[in-house]
Amino acid sequence: MSIGGALWSGLKAWVTPPDRHALVREAKARAAALLPPGETVVDGHTVEPGERVPHPPKPYRVDAFGIRPTAGDRVLNGAERVELALDRVNPFNAALDAWDRRGEDRSAQWHGGWQSAAGRLAAALRPRTEKKYLSVLLLTGVGLHVVRVQLSSDGKKVAGAVEHACAVARQDITWLRDRKDVRHGTHEIGFADGSWVTVFLPLGGWGTLVEQFPRRLRHTDPMP
């Protein structure tokens, strides 16, 4: 391959966005492989915390993959956050964002202490890390699991570590409410201890997962 061809190939790979659906499929497979032998996955999907679910205080926050962020990681990711902030203050982008969030409920997105089931799930979704990763929500016959799958530095492929982050017994999951009035893919999960937390299921394909939850509620239904 010529130097020009090599440069073009590298540039093309750099600007080509990742195949998100393929990335999710691989992350789900890697996450499922981490479960105890004999525990069968009913369904799963990548998951993110609701936007206004708070970061856990220091005693409840963990270092993802057992690695404390380095100064170099913080500099690189800080640059990405600056770029994102500049993008958001662009008047055109701000108008689009406001339209997308029209009618959004600005109230709290969780309830319960950090030691509650909802608190443990929320903390698992907000670890301390500068690495790129996906959180995978797996529902099995035994419980609900959150597994973190590390991605490559460009976020385009699964690479590196996989770790179990949280588990809740299936009998402790009492309801799930669809909050499509907030954002398509947003759901509230309620637990037997009275706690609940908002999560976001990105991309499509999560319908079969939510069908497995007990007592599914619409956004027009009152909070249990």
Where do the PLM segments sit?
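Anionic N-terminal interaction surfaces
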Residues: 2-137
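Low-complexity intrinsically disordered segments
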Residues: 2-41, 45-46, 162-224
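Phosphoinositide-binding peripheral membrane targeting modules
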Residues: 82-196, 203-208
